[in-house]
């Protein structure tokens, strides 16, 4: 009968266990790929003390028990050791054909993970507390609440892949961010009717911004996304039927420059009606066009709104213009205008029609929303005045019904 192996304390070692000359314990096993793997610890059992100068650690027998539980539960003991960066890369590789801005967003998050200590951690070692600490670090580094929430959602999706692949049991990013950080997201600006009138009147009369009056008016009266607006070309306008055809958007990237994208969803492809004010504004835009050299971008030309270099304007151009316009207005007027962006004008358009009682499905179509919930959120932007007006309208209709009856 062969003699049992013992450690330097005379304790019998089990199958696969051994002790190195430096006193460290080792456990050898064969993984699912038939490759030998090793687990180490300075302690055989939990009650052991680590040698002087060595960091405390989990005992070998505890590690073996955890390993055997993983194997019993079907956990991939090799896969669970991949880093968070590797897991995120794996998720992205499963969906390689994405839009340019999605690709850019992925790159930003990967760069963040590579610089953060969480990125090199094995996924099996990441706990909910680690994920929450990551969110706090992101906030301390100046990232906005919504940006952190978007990145957290991506990492949560990555861990669902790891769970499906039996690499881990739980998702450390499955928590509410608002329980960790205060939501400092600034509410989207909705212009009141009075603010809308003052903005348009000031732009129309101002020597610098009068050239932008029709652009602002069209945005307020069509609710277009700024990328859709910037991508408008002459063939997109149907004056006979008073429609604006939307089937593409114009974007600009710091690396590749201008490019055309199709709408993110099929709902983005639509025909937006021209109300009279928008119709007349488009007519003025065409009448004021100069016969300059026209650029072509991905097969599209005859863009309606050009900058001084005859390139089509994009979101950054309009953000800068609106910022300057509001700043100038507020300099000369006591009744200040709020911070306004091109999206504020789209938000105002949708809210106005929601408060006017437009059928939600009709408004969803005009806005190009993929989900009706997005549209219904605008119906929640009612003010006390609009709520009171709506109650009066409904009461008046009821009274008229009674009189008819």
UniProtKB/Swiss-Prot annotation:
Entries under InterPro entries matching the protein: CB, DNA-bd_dom_sf, DNA_brk_join_enz, Integrase-like_cat_sf, Integrase_catalytic, Integrase_recombinase_N, Integrase_Tn916-type_DNA-bd_N, Tyrosine_recombinase_XerCD
Domain Tyr recombinase: from-to ranges: 186-392
Keywords carried by this UniProt record: DNA integration, DNA recombination, DNA-binding, Transposable element, Viral genome integration, Virus entry into host cell
Active site per database record: 225, 264, 343, 346, 369, 379
All residue ranges annotated as the Core-binding (CB) domain in the record: 79-163
GO BP, sorted A to Z: DNA recombination; establishment of integrated proviral latency; symbiont entry into host cell; viral genome integration into host DNA
Statement: the UniProt record of this protein carries the keyword Ribosomal protein: no
GO molecular function, one term: integrase activity
Gene3D superfamilies per the UniProt record, alphabetical: 1.10.150.130, Classic Zinc Finger, Intergrase catalytic core
DNA-binding keyword on record: yes
Family indicated by similarity: Belongs to the 'phage' integrase family.
Entry protein name: Transposase from transposon Tn1545
Organism: Streptococcus agalactiae serotype V (strain ATCC BAA-611 / 2603 V/R)
Lineage: Bacteria, Bacillati, Bacillota, Bacilli, Lactobacillales
Gene that this sequence comes from: int
